[in-house]
């Protein structure tokens, strides 16, 4: 009898563990204490390890496609290029964004991209998720929830660095991160090798980090301070007109 009860208890425990693993690791913003973050963006200028960290205080996120959010839209507190753009085209089409993506609660088919090793998704409420690996089911779920999502190269997942070091040359790199249960955008302060940027991120120790598109033109981005003043992180450049998508945080 004891053996039977023990076996039953073991099966129940294993089933619970399996269900827990299948759910993924969503983060719920509503459980976080944001009292120490002034609206709408806090900049943590971490000069010591060569990073600038932007913490948007937001109520919603979307992947805006086709036209960059206007600086006159006072509801926007931060926006930056997210997924890769496949080709330099004069006209916008969702198929020119690398990887399937969700914008405004609708899933779109994008171009194939072997570098998209993970994804980020916002579920349209207070929860988000970073994924390492296949993310098609995640996009279906987030579209059904009215959220947003896009694929990119995962750098760090669950605190572990993901290899290979696939970028060449020096650049001012950027990543979307989760740090201490909060979303932030992390930029290298100077031009560095990708390997150096990963090392800086490892020292910053986020739970998750997902690459964001950068380079001259692609790095044009901006944020709004608590007085409503817009600050451009990088100016408009020749190739900025080819940008296709922007992760956008709304107050």
Question: Predicted regions: what is each one?
Answer:
Residues 92-108, 167, 178, 182-191, ...:
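Conserved, well-ordered active-site substructure
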Residues 18-21:
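C-terminal motif of bacterial Sec signal peptides marking the signal peptidase cleavage site
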Residues 116-118, 170-175, 243-244:
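Short glycine-rich loop/turn motifs
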Residues 1-9:
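Bacterial N-terminal signal peptides that target proteins for export
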Residues 23-112, 186-187:
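Zymogen propeptides
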Residues 150-175, 180:
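Conserved beta-alpha junction segments in alpha/beta enzyme cores
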Residues 89-160:
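Active-site-adjacent helix-turn-beta-strand microarchitecture at beta-sheet edges
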